């Protein structure tokens, strides 16, 4: 049975597996961005691995939206980043407040995002009353994915997990707002674009990877990291071309729009 109003299309890989891999890669990416930044590799490695959190989040959106959220697909993506923003900021600032090593920030972000996601998930079930059996788990997963995507891309940009640097170069200059929108689109867009009677897990995941790469490209441009700009746009083009070919193959018909007439007939 296909997506788009209920039911589940066949999964290539279990949701838990994709989520675990995506979050693990983004967690490692936060640390590598911190340590490799002095060598000019923070955005190249950190940005690449941060995109994995976007894929994990997009896959969870696909899972929960299959229960019939309808126009709620973009909304739940924004909720993911709303929860993630709180968790990412808390994860960076809590170590400073309690005099803990700042390198524990990604771990604290994971913990805080899981707690926030669980609480929001419980509230959506009661008192809001959304009768989706996987809602609590999905909101927890989305909160974690949103937080790790935000933290991953912003740390890759800042080049450090040190609280004051993060405040100056991720919060005070508005980079967190860019991360909110860019990562949010990367998480909500894949299933929103692919849902329908013939949705396939492979095609949705392919677009999710492309969205992760284009988010990485955006941050590379803002940071003016030439190597990351070139690598990210090449990887995006490769994956996106693959997605377009898959879409043509799966479509029942492909209708090309004719050239607009130069003058009225």
Curated annotation (Swiss-Prot):
GO terms for biological process: methanogenesis, from carbon dioxide; methylation; one-carbon metabolic process. It is a multi-pass membrane protein. The chain crosses the membrane at residues 18-38, 41-61, 75-95, 100-120, 141-161, 175-195, 202-222, 224-244. Its EC number is 7.2.1.4. GO terms for molecular function: tetrahydromethanopterin S-methyltransferase activity. It is an enzyme of class 7 (translocase). Keywords: Cell membrane, Membrane, Methanogenesis, Methyltransferase, One-carbon metabolism, Transferase, Translocase, Transmembrane, Transmembrane helix. It is found in: Cell membrane. Pathway: One-carbon metabolism; methanogenesis from CO(2); methyl-coenzyme M from 5,10-methylene-5,6,7,8-tetrahydromethanopterin: step 2/2. It catalyses: 5-methyl-5,6,7,8-tetrahydromethanopterin + coenzyme M + 2 Na(+)(in) = 5,6,7,8-tetrahydromethanopterin + methyl-coenzyme M + 2 Na(+)(out). It holds the Pfam family MtrC. Coiled coil: none annotated. InterPro entries: THM_MeTrfase_su_C. Its main location: membrane. One of its GO terms (cellular component) is plasma membrane. The keyword DNA-binding does not apply. Belongs to the MtrC family. Part of a complex that catalyzes the formation of methyl-coenzyme M and tetrahydromethanopterin from coenzyme M and methyl-tetrahydromethanopterin. This is an energy-conserving, sodium-ion translocating step. The complex is composed of 8 subunits; MtrA, MtrB, MtrC, MtrD, MtrE, MtrF, MtrG and MtrH. This is Tetrahydromethanopterin S-methyltransferase subunit C. It comes from Methanocaldococcus jannaschii (strain ATCC 43067 / DSM 2661 / JAL-1 / JCM 10045 / NBRC 100440) (Methanococcus jannaschii).
């Amino acid at each position: 049975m296909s997506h788009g109003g209920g039911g589940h299309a066949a999964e290539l890989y279990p949701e838990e597996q994709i989520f675990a891999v995506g979050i693990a890669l983004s967690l490692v990416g936060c640390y590598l961005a911190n340590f490799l930044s002095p060598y000019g590799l923070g955005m190249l490695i950190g940005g690449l691995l941060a995109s994995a959190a976007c894929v994990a989040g997009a896959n969870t959106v696909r899972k929960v939206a299959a229960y019939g959220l309808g126009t709620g697909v973009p909304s739940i993506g924004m909720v993911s980043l709303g929860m993630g923003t709180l968790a990412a900021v808390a994860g960076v600032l809590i170590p400073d407040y309690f005099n803990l090593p700042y390198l524990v920030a990604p771990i604290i972000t994971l913990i805080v995002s899981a707690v926030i996601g669980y609480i929001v998930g419980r509230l959506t079930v009661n008192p809001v009353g959304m009768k989706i059996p996987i809602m609590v788990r999905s909101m927890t997963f989305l909160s974690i994915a949103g937080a790790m995507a935000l933290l991953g891309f912003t740390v890759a940009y800042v080049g450090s997990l040190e609280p004051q640097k993060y405040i100056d170069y991720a919060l005070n200059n508005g980079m967190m707002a860019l991360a909110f929108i860019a990562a949010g689109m990367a998480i909500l867009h894949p299933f929103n674009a692919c849902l329908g009677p013939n949705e396939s897990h492979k095609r949705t995941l392919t677009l999710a990877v492309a969205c992760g790469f284009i988010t990485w490209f955006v941050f590379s441009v803002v940071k003016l990291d030439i190597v990351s700009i070139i690598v990210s746009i090449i990887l995006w083009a490769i994956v996106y071309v693959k997605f377009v070919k898959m879409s043509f193959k799966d479509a029942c018909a492909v209708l090309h729009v004719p050239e607009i007439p130069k003058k009225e007939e």
